């Protein structure tokens, strides 16, 4: 819709900062562990019972927008429905930071998460830009032979062509409920 397109454009032109949607106090009724990696927030959310599965969550937002209440709801549902731990990394965003800084922080956080939660089975989850970032993380893990490697990866509408120049992008937009050409 037109209003949605205007909101998306506003987020890219003047991205909101410190919206607080994924602070520890927002997760009512959950167990949380919050810390930071070089000034960037990381929070692990779990329930009373966990099954050993641990999702490392990379949010979408075009690499400029912070996580939203929708991301928080996804995290809460993964914890409630599947007994998973979910760790969210509030990674550096553009235009203030470069992709190099984002990769550096995400990889430091990944190492800390896997050390703090030794023995968990790790999964990587990314939506939209977070899906593209998840693929970059997998490449770094592979190239640098970092373990543990995620057991599974879930990419929800991953943004993998930042130029938006793929001639078949229109076909993909028809099948992808999150992808819009606006």
Named regions from a protein language model:
Residues 33-182:
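Alpha/beta-hydrolase superfamily serine-hydrolase fold, recognizing
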